[in-house]
Amino acid sequence: MISPDNNVTFILGPTNTGKTFMAIERMVSYDNGIIGLPLRLLAREVYDKIVVKKGKLNTALITGEEQIIPPRARYFICTVEAMPTDKLVDFIAVDEIQLCNDYERGHIFTEKLLYARGNIESLFLGSDNIEPIIRKLFPHSKIIKKKRRSKLSYIGKKSFFSLPKRSAVVAFKTIDVYN
């Protein structure tokens, strides 16, 4: 049975709209929480930020490669696959929930979508393309739409060293970045 959607909010929008930042800020406003992120390096980056705000003894990092779990941790920053299922927390967030559609990892994101709930608040972040499914599964949930704050554009092939500040490099293979 799908968990009730009375405390579930979806934040949908394109990349670079502040969805993850919003979830982090919401989590640290509670006494405890769990956030599931799609990438190990992103989990590490968020962990480092939460440690500054809440302290090393209160913050755990759980990924497939790293486990830093202080005995009294209250905030758990994880890859989605590594999110603990035995912890009752006030807040839960899952980032990039549209990965429910992913062939390899979709079952994990779908499980979190259907069953992961915070006692007070549950946030699911993702792109707009998941909205039709959300509306069918969670007809009473709140959906917040975010718009991109800055322009994203393709500037063609450039030397890595000649990129303007705040540029993003998108590649499907590491070797493509070096080429």
Region locations from a protein language model:
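Residues at the beta-strand->loop junction immediately N-terminal to the Walker
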Residues: 12-13, 24, 170
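Walker B catalytic acidic pair
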Residues: 80, 95-97
